[in-house]
């Protein structure tokens, strides 16, 4: 299930189902709320503001994301799945890119639009591989948790790097590790490994492989069994891993206020 609550009290919510459930959308919704009582309690007093609907497929992808005098934002161009909530961050990254394009003139250059188009294609593939791996692993929580670590390492490394080492052109760095020599190929490789992780030994090796694969960008100490999946904000871990960010210990410590928006 996905659930997005807005400030004015309206919530966008829905279920993603592997197989079609018989009945009208209203009947399916009520059935799922009964099946999951905790969710049912949360939505017990909710009323729909529009008719409930069923869509056989939510994924889409167009042939191009940009052309002469036009460009699409990511979700107009392609959508994969709500899992990992990539939408807002990806859209903001694209808006930043387009804003940079307009800094050089009234209309973005053909070269900039081609670059924008190529990045959105590559990033759609990246999201697709990451989500496909997560669905493949979903029946085994330990495998799913390991797959999720790939996502969390990607976003935490990028967020920390952009705050501690800001760059005017950071928007052109690929979303979710696209173009990163350390992480760029990890989602596709993880999907391939998950498809062949049939035995317990294979599954243990996959978890170990993820830990090794994300290590060069793991600034937050993720994939640590001792935490039992609970990761508080731990600046000491970040400071110890200053080299991962290409910073000295002293320079990282002095830059820490930037993590909360300080100067």
Per-segment meaning from a language model:
Residues 101-263:
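C-terminal helical "tail/cap" subdomain of flavin- and related membrane-associated enzymes
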């Amino acid at each position: 299930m996905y659930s997005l609550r807005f400030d004015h009290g309206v919530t966008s919510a829905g279920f993603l189902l592997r197989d079609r459930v018989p009945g009208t959308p209203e009947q399916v919704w009520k059935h799922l709320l009964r099946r999951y009582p905790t969710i049912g309690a949360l939505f017990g007093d909710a009323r729909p503001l529009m008719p409930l609907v069923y869509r056989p497929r939510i994924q889409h992808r167009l042939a191009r994301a940009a052309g002469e005098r036009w460009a699409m934002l990511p979700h107009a161009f392609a959508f994969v799945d709500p899992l990992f909530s990539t939408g807002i961050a990806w859209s903001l990254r694209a808006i930043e890119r387009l804003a940079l394009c307009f800094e050089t003139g009234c209309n973005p250059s053909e070269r900039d639009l081609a670059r924008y188009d190529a990045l959105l294609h590559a990033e759609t593939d990246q999201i697709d591989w990451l989500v496909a791996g997560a669905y493949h692993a979903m029946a085994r929580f330990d495998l799913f948790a390991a797959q999720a670590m790939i996502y969390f390492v990607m976003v935490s490394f990028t967020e920390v790097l952009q705050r501690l080492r800001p760059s005017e052109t950071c928007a052109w760095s690929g979303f979710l590790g696209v173009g990163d020599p350390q992480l760029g190929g990890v989602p596709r490789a993880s999907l391939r490994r998950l498809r062949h992780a049939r035995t317990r030994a294979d599954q243990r090796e996959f978890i170990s492989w993820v830990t090794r694969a994300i290590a060069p960008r793991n600034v937050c100490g993720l994939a640590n069994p001792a935490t039992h999946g609970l990761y508080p904000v731990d600046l000491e871990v970040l400071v110890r891993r200053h080299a991962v960010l290409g910073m000295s210990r002293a320079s990282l410590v002095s830059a820490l206020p930037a993590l909360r928006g300080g100067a």
